[in-house]
Amino acid sequence: MTQPTILITGANRGLGLKFTELYAQKKFNVLATCRAPQNAERLLQLAEQSDLISIYPLDVGINEEIEDLSHKIKDVPIDILINNAGIWRSSSLGSANKQAWLESFAINSIAPYEVIQTLLPNIKMGVLKKVVSITSKMGSIDDNTSGGSYIYRSSKSALNMVMRSLENDLRPYDIATLTLHPGWVQTDMGGMNALINDEQSVSGMIEVIDALNIKNSGRFIDYAGKHINW
């Protein structure tokens, strides 16, 4: 097998940066994407240390940038695609801003679909054929026992439904899908009071992704491999 290739969105910090680091250590060719590479100091440092990391500009909320990326990597097989880019907008009862809600749906729910759809020819060319979207247990309808966080919860619930549909539509191409909860992680989004660090989360998620195949495709699980109800 030739050296596998992985594409990661939101690779400039947090989980995306750690995915980039650890997959490069696993000898993957890493296509690391983010909105403003020129400002991504830690990602640029990783790329200087490894010739396996290539950086591409990508704002997942702008379709033209997704199309531009697809042209740049037109003939590159993608073995694993990780939709990691996402945003958090605070919202409680009485404070859910409509514009913030629409923005969250655009980035958290629609953009992963757009990225997958546009890069589908590359994924079909890959050997491993795995599509992963980083979601949250907060998007689980079954698990919602505390309310609040209307914007984030609903945007991730929508992403979960997108991934359920994609599981059916991509299966004929032998493309396996995974909807993955990273845990509560100490990142800019998760905060420093979170339960685990990025190394623990991403190392666990990589093990789960390693085990992904067409037979167990379509699951919603966490970084430790634990099943989550939709």
Named regions from a protein language model:
Residues N12, G16-E21:
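N-terminal Rossmann NAD(P)H-binding glycine-rich loop of SDR-like oxidoreductase domains
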Residues A47-E64:
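Rossmann-fold cofactor-recognition segment
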Residues A24-R42:
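Conserved glycine-rich Rossmann-like NAD(P)H-binding loop of the short-chain dehydrogenase/reductase
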Residues I87-F105, K124-R171:
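Catalytic loop of short-chain dehydrogenase/reductase
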Residues T179-P182, G191-W230:
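C-terminal helical subdomain
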Residues I82, V115-L119, I123, V162-M163:
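Hydrophobic positions on the long internal alpha-helix
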Residues D59-V76:
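Conserved Rossmann-fold cofactor-binding substructure of NAD(P)-dependent oxidoreductases
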